[in-house]
Amino acid sequence: MKTEGEKLVADTDNFIKETLAKYPNLAGKSVAMCYINAADLSNFSVYRTADPRGAYLTDLGFTFPEKIEAQAQDKNAFYVQISAELAVESLSDTDIIITYGDDKTIAALQKDAIFSKVPAVKEGRVVVLDSNGNLAAACNPSVLSVKAELVNYLDAINAVVK
């Protein structure tokens, strides 16, 4: 059983490496995996690398935005909650925002007086993962989900890169 598990992990690592090679323009981009409630834009949360969602992105070669990390009071916390008033400053070094939501999320961000000034929002570099969809679950990876959804996840991210 141990040997089979090690082989599965090695095969998955190879799959990730081969898949990432098809997306060279994503390498080194800063990405914030957020929770933004379009019905209440008074604050938002960003999952840090202590959370599997944030760690997965750094494992895929993305960087974690420094200005978000600077907001973290507790360096062991899995997320940092930020007041909307600080959104523009906090997300100014973020190339891509990923958030859960629906087909109304981007429109809500673009109409909001503050979030509309965030460079990634203004320039259309926001990936919205359907809260009830496979990608929303797959951004919390397992060795079994990676092969099923990695290409779809990277395609969604790649689609917003300018």
Task: Write out the residue ranges for each language-model feature.
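N-terminal post-signal-peptidase region of extra-cytosolic proteins
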Residues: 77-84, 111
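Short, conserved beta-strand edge motifs with alternating hydrophobic and charged residues
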Residues: 30-36, 67-68, 98-100
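Structured C-terminal subdomain patch of bacterial secreted/periplasmic proteins
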Residues: 92-162
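Extracytoplasmic substrate-binding proteins
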Residues: 1-41, 136-162
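Alpha-helical, coiled-coil/dimerization segments enriched in small aliphatic residues
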Residues: 43-80, 134
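Short helices/loops that flank or line small-molecule/ion binding pockets
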Residues: 81-93
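Short secondary-structure boundary/capping segments
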Residues: 23, 54, 117-119
